[in-house]
Amino acid sequence: MKNKTFIKNKTLFAASLALMMALPMQAQRFEDNFEDKTLRLDYIVAGDSVNQAIYFEQAYSNPTWAGRKTRLDEKFLNGNGQVTVYEHGTNKVLYVNTFSTLFQEWQLTQEAKHLQKSFESSFLVPFPKKPVDVS
């Protein structure tokens, strides 16, 4: 009985190893979708303790990308929001990152219960080579 268990575990291990080796081959390469530049997206976030609205302001190109170049479609931390870059037309996720803004912290204050305010916020994403959708 011990041999059968060993063979079963050995087969499971071999299958797991083959799967792990195949995964990196399917991972997207930074260079396929992005230039070594940064796309800075500026927004205004406005509202009060209950309501919030986000208004796109402008976009800038910065000369280099200082963010991660691997595992681009995975989020590593939880935040109050998420910026996602999709390939236009296919909705394939090319890049994802989470964030928390100063506005979201302010929403928890007493002042936010009786006053509306707006805050500037910027999101940095790798500069796409082709048209993308950002949400």
Predicted regions and their residues:
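Bacterial N-terminal signal peptides that target proteins for export
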Residues: 2-13
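Intrinsically disordered, low-complexity segments enriched in Ser/Pro/Gly/Ala and basic residues
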Residues: 12-15, 80
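Bacterial N-terminal signal peptides
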Residues: 14-22
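Boundary at the C-terminal end of the N-terminal hydrophobic targeting segment
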Residues: 25-27
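Beta-strand-enriched, solvent-exposed domains that form extended recognition/catalytic surfaces
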Residues: 33-135
